[in-house]
Amino acid sequence: MGGVLSLLFNISEIAAELSLSTGFTVDAILTGEAFAAVSTEAAWLIEIEAVDLAGLSTLEALSLTGLTTEQFSLLSAIPTALNNAIGIGVFFQTVSGASAVVAAGVTTFGYSKEVPVVNMALVPWFPQVDYLFPGFTSFSYYLNAVLDWGESLFHAVGREVWRHLMRQATLQIGQATRAVAVRSTNELSHTLAQIAENARWALTSGPVHIYSSVQDYYRYLPARNPIQLRQEYRNRGEPPPSRADFEYQENREGQRARRELGYDEPRSGQYVEHYTAPGGAHQRVTQDWMLPLILGLYGDITPTWEVELNKLEKEEDGPSKKKARRSMQKNMPYSRSRPQAPSKRRSRGARSKNRA
């Protein structure tokens, strides 16, 4: 086993010296990448016939790559010797397994990287700190929060203050708008009520004149002759009356017209007397016929209308359950004795009923 270790040590020294003379890295020499690169370059020179054109031999053409024959031989022999040494170490395993451990260590040895890994610009991987020190990430987070509390606290408090201000501003604007609308409505209602109370009201018969004019128009129309009356009765499918009936009907209509003309028509322009508060109290007063209007402007209702509304609400909601229960209790027969539950037992003792 000591010979294997000395062989590996010598191979490492030769690879280090060869790296200084050729410019290749130690890991490239041990893995065989340097030999593969030199072989590829020599094959390329032979392919383009540079050796034949120059009139040089193959060994002299190898010097064009910058390497000597000894260096080329060492580049090809070192990877093979390293693999053989590792195989010998695995073959001569001891009971304790020291040779296997040495072989594994030599196999890695920092030079067992693959070609893509060597050529690519990768970042070394480090395990998570929590694997080695559980809870360190949480501790670092809280430590960072404690160290940077000033800025975060300023932003958090500023954000909450801004949200509170916006919320309060929205509420204040809504309340102010609602208050202005309610105040404007109340002022308008109060103004209309004052106008209605202090206005000068007069009785007029304008609508009555309209209906009376229509009535006079139909009254003074020419009377229908007997032929028109008979035709009207025939259209309705009724037997026409006699001449005496016609005369009686005409006399009756004339008497009714004369009786209606004898009535006095209501005069227009009669003003309603406005009375002040009794006793000089200077309180607001209004006429009885104007009271529903004034109360409606202020949002109140008259007692009569309140009774009507209560009736309508009771009809919509239906009779209450309490009244229905009372009516059921009245209809049930009255009895003093209360029914006993079937689950009750008179004798709950452990002794038997036959105690004799």
From Swiss-Prot:
GO terms for biological process: symbiont entry into host cell; viral penetration into host nucleus. GO terms for cellular component: host cell; host cell endoplasmic reticulum membrane; host cell nucleus; membrane; viral capsid. The keyword Transmembrane helix applies. A motif (Nuclear localization signal) lies at residues 320-326. Residues 329-340 have a biased composition (Polar residues). Residues 244-267 have a biased composition (Basic and acidic residues). InterPro entries: Polyoma_coat_VP2. Keywords: Capsid protein, DNA-binding, Host endoplasmic reticulum, Host membrane, Host nucleus, Late protein, Lipoprotein, Membrane, Myristate, Transmembrane, Transmembrane helix, Viral penetration into host nucleus, Virion, Virus entry into host cell. GO terms for molecular function: DNA binding; structural molecule activity. Residues 268-303 are annotated as: D1. The chain crosses the membrane at residues 289-309. A lipid is attached at residue 2 (N-myristoyl glycine). Residues 233-267, 312-356 are annotated as: Disordered. Residues 308-354 are annotated as: DNA-binding. Residues 343-356 have a biased composition (Basic residues). Belongs to the polyomaviruses capsid protein VP2 family. This is Minor capsid protein VP2.
